[in-house]
Design a protein with these regions (language model features):
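C-terminal subdomains that position terminal phosphate/3'-OH groups for nucleotidyl transfer/ligation
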Residues: 92-176
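Sequence-structural signature of the catalytic-core scaffold of metal-dependent phosphohydrolases
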Residues: 1-113, 122
C-alpha cells in the first residue's frame, strides 16, 4: 500500500519497507511492473490493485460498522435505515422500501440495505477506477477511489463516517 522506504516516510510515518529491505522490494516492484517515481530509487507508484483493495476495505468496514451498531442498539432501526437509504436516488429508494415491506426481521432489512449500499459503492469505485485508469497506471492518481465517487453517495458515505466517529467508535459497548 505504501511503496516507499521508511527513510522517505517523513511526517506520514507510514511506509512499505525498511531501507534494509530495499533490494527485495526493488525485485518485487520490477516483477509487478511498478513505476518508479521522481527518479527516487526508493519510491514507487502504488500498484493499481491496491486502489481496488483499499476501496473494498473502506466500503466493507464502513458498512459493517453501521450494521453492527444497529445490532448492538447503538443506532436505532430508523437511524440505520436513514443512513443507508441516503445513498440512493428517490426512484431506487422507493424500490428498496417496497422490498423492505416484505422482510419482517429488522436485522434482515438492515442486511439487505447494507448489501445494496455495498453494491452501489462497488459500482461507484469501479467507475472511479475506469475514469482515472490512465492516471492510476501512470502513478499520478491522488487519493483513494472512495474520494472520487459521485456526490450523493459521497455525501452519504461522509455522513456515515461522521456518525461512526460520534456515536459508534465512542460507544461504551464498542470501547469495552
Amino acid at each position: 500500500k505504501y511503496p516507499f522506504s521508511s527513510s522517505l516516510a517523513g511526517q506520514k510515518s507510514k511506509f512499505g519497507f525498511f531501507t534494509t529491505e530495499e533490494e527485495s522490494f526493488r525485485r518485487i516492484a520490477e516483477e509487478l511492473g511498478m513505476k518508479q517515481l521522481n527518479g527516487s530509487p526508493l519510491k514507487y507508484a502504488r500498484h493499481p490493485l491496491v486502489y481496488l483493495v483499499e476501496a473494498a476495505d473502506d466500503i466493507c468496514y464502513q458498512m459493517m460498522d453501521i450494521e453492527d451498531a444497529h445490532k448492538l442498539k447503538i443506532l436505532t432501526t430508523q437511524e440505520t435505515q436513514d443512513l443507508l437509504l441516503a445513498y440512493f436516488p428517490d426512484e431506487r429508494k422507493a424500490h428498496i422500501l417496497d422490498t423492505l415491506k416484505i422482510v419482517s426481521d429488522t436485522n434482515e432489512q438492515i442486511a439487505y440495505l447494507r448489501s445494496s449500499v455495498i453494491g452501489l459503492l462497488i459500482g461507484e469505485c469501479t467507475r472511479a477506477f475506469l475514469d482515472n485508469e490512465v492516471q492510476i497506471l501512470e502513478g499520478e492518481f491522488e487519493g483513494s477511489l472512495i474520494k472520487h465517487i459521485t456526490e450523493r453517495p459521497a455525501t452519504a458515505y461522509q455522513h456515515c463516517a461522521e456518525v461512526s466517529f460520534k456515536k459508534i467508535y465512542r460507544s461504551r459497548d464498542v470501547l469495552d
